UniProtKB/Swiss-Prot annotation:
It comes from Sus scrofa (Pig). Its main location: nucleus. Binds to beta-catenin (CTNNB1), PYGO1 and PYGO2; the interaction with PYGO1 increases PYGO1 affinity to histone H3 methylated at 'Lys 4'. PANTHER family: B-CELL CLL_LYMPHOMA 9 PROTEIN, BCL9. Residues 1-16 have a biased composition (Polar residues). Residues 1-130 are annotated as: Disordered. Involved in signal transduction through the Wnt pathway. Promotes beta-catenin's transcriptional activity. The keyword Nucleus applies. One of its GO terms (molecular function) is transcription coactivator activity. InterPro entries: Bcl-9/Bcl-9l (IPR015668). This is B-cell CLL/lymphoma 9 protein. Belongs to the BCL9 family.
Amino acid sequence: PMGMTQPLSHSNQMPSPNAMGPNIPPHGVPMGPGLMSHNPIMGHGSQEPPMVPQGRMGFPQGFPPVQSPPQQVPFPHNGPSGGQGNFPGGMGFPGEGPLGRPSNLPQSSADAALCKPGGPGGPDSFAVLG
């Protein structure tokens, strides 16, 4: 038990001590399925271009599409970025000021981020990031 707990703890802390540690549980849940869903979505990315523009223009106002684009942005960013600073810092800071204001996606991104991790990840991830 102890040996397992330590490796697990180190495993989570290895990626990131605090940022990823707490973020992994909340984000891990949506990330797992999200990444899988995004995998196909990313692959379809080439075919989605037509849908992306449409979804962005008309969907951002809608609910389902809004969560899809934002989800794709934060999750994929988090994966490739490895939670460097784009996801943590980008979500709170850029999402609110530079990115959130000028961009429509950031706006929905904040919504999706709040809605997705909402209870478990929302406050936790925000508090940790902040």
